[in-house]
């Protein structure tokens, strides 16, 4: 926590000639920053009788909350599911490179792996604040190994697991300590899954439903046990059927706890999800849509063979497959590309597209007071965009951490 006195004495930055995303609208207002947080200018004027120490003209551009990616498996040759002696350096590389795509916070994601990989990797990726070194780490997303064999997708079958008699202890034996974990994806139809969901939720860990053959009733029961997220909607789950819509049916279910918002990840890369499916999901439940990249180590590398955990992946153009198959294996589209494709495919408002990559993931993780918003008091993590939503600059805690060459003075 920053000291109030220290913050009060810090320099005040005023970002002018901009449109800021606040309250679901793009407003022609200035953005004020001090001590790494968004400042209320009225308090500055009337209570402290101060003005800005520095003004920065944004040239009419958009200022939106920094993007938050809650499912990213690696990128730029780094595979988070590879048990190396220096996992941290790989995470740092990805954290630095994704700044150019407007991402200010992320959840490094591990795909299904043997226990020894989790035991070696998980302790090496702690929660970390963002800054000039790169985007902040909000905690790990462990996708598998407690998932369906039928809907395993690119996850290696040899390492899939079901829950043993003492289910939560079995999970701990698989993963090791959970201090660095923020999200766990599991299949709710697995025996004893509900006691695991309750135990994880009690520890403040978000439970996501995915890689599953669960019917709607099983999915609803999982939500009552504490699940709040769906991993890459439509992918690796039963297809929608009018008599039993499966997990997809959670978007419009009337059998959920009162006031509970179900969030769901969407890979809007132009490959994983047909534009019509994107439109259906968004129109059915817009406030729960969370854009994710599901990016793999091949992000930024081009065609050829790469790894993803224990599997080989082949990239051909804009698509990644498990080598030798036509099974999709994550995405190679960065977050800003997903935002632009989502906007174009759904015809939604620019505000909605931006909130799907910022506010909604923050709400999913319970961080909406500090992340995913430009409200007063929030962290000054934001992205500067042109009218076509190309990233011009990225700020973390009010500090410029990346700038496009064309935007440099």
Swiss-Prot record:
Binding site for substrate: 154-155, 235-236, 243, 269-272, 328-330
Domain of life: Eukaryota
Pfam families, sorted: Amidohydro_1
EC number(s) stated in the UniProt entry for this protein: 3.5.1.25
Catalytic activity of the protein: N-acetyl-D-glucosamine 6-phosphate + H2O = D-glucosamine 6-phosphate + acetate
GO biological process: N-acetylglucosamine catabolic process; N-acetylneuraminate catabolic process; negative regulation of UDP-N-acetylglucosamine biosynthetic process; UDP-N-acetylglucosamine biosynthetic process
Co-factor note (free text): Binds 1 divalent metal cation per subunit.
GO MF annotations in UniProt: metal ion binding; N-acetylglucosamine-6-phosphate deacetylase activity
Effect recorded for residue 294 to N: In a colorectal cancer sample; somatic mutation
KW rRNA-binding (keyword) present: no
InterPro entries for this protein: Amidohydro-rel, GlcNAc_6-P_deAcase, Metal-dep_hydrolase_composite, Metal_Hydrolase
Keyword vocabulary terms for this entry: Carbohydrate metabolism, Hydrolase, Metal-binding
Described function: Hydrolyzes the N-glycolyl group from N-glycolylglucosamine 6-phosphate (GlcNGc-6-P) in the N-glycolylneuraminic acid (Neu5Gc) degradation pathway. Although human is not able to catalyze formation of Neu5Gc due to the inactive CMAHP enzyme, Neu5Gc is present in food and must be degraded.
Gene Ontology CC entries for this record: cytosol; nucleus
Organism of provenance: Homo sapiens (Human)
Record protein name field: N-acetylglucosamine-6-phosphate deacetylase
Cofactor: a divalent metal cation
Binding site for a divalent metal cation: 143, 211, 232
Family membership noted in the UniProt record: Belongs to the metallo-dependent hydrolases superfamily. NagA family.
């Amino acid at each position: 926590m920053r000291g109030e006195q220290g913050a009060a004495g810090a320099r005040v930055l005023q970002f002018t000639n901009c449109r800021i995303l606040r309250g679901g609208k793009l407003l022609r207002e200035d953005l004020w920053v001090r001590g790494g947080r968004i400042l209320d200018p009225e308090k500055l004027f009337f209570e402290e009788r101060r003005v800005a120490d520095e003004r920065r003209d944004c040239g009419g551009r958009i200022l939106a909350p920094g993007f938050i990616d809650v499912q990213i498996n690696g990128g730029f040759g780094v595979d988070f599911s590879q048990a190396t002696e220096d996992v941290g350096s790989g995470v740092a590389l990805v954290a630095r490179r994704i700044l150019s795509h407007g991402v200010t916070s992320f959840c490094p994601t591990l795909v299904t792996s043997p226990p020894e990989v989790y035991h070696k990797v998980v302790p090496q990726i702690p929660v970390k604040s963002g800054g000039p070194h790169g985007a902040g780490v909000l905690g790990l997303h462990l996708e598998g190994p407690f998932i369906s064999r039928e809907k395993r997708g690119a996850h290696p079958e040899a390492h899939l697991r079901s829950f043993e008699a003492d289910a939560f202890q079995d999970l701990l034996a698989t993963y090791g300590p959970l201090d660095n974990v923020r999200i766990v994806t599991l299949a709710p139809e697995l025996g004893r899954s509900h006691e695991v969901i309750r135990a994880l939720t009690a520890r403040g860990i978000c439970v996501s439903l995915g890689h599953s053959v669960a019917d709607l009733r099983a999915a609803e029961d999982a939500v009552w046990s504490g699940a709040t997220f769906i991993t890459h909607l439509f992918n690796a789950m039963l297809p929608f059927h009018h008599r039993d819509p499966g997990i997809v049916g959670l978007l419009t279910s009337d059998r959920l706890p009162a006031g509970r918002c179900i969030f769901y990840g969407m890979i809007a890369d132009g490959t994983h999800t047909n534009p019509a499916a994107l439109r259906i999901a968004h129109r059915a439940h817009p406030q729960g849509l969370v854009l994710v990249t599901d990016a793999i180590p091949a992000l930024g590398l081009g065609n050829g063979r790469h790894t993803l955990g224990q599997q080989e992946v082949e990239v051909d153009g804009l698509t990644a497959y498990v080598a030798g198959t036509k099974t999709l294996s994550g995405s190679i589209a960065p977050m800003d590309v997903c935002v632009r494709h989502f906007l174009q495919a759904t015809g939604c408002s620019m505000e909605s597209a931006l909130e799907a990559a910022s506010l909604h993931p923050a709400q999913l993780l319970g961080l909406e007071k500090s992340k995913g918003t430009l409200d007063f008091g929030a962290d000054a993590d934001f992205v500067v965009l042109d009218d076509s939503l190309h990233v011009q600059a990225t700020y973390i805690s009010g500090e410029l951490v990346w700038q496009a060459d064309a935007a440099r003075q």
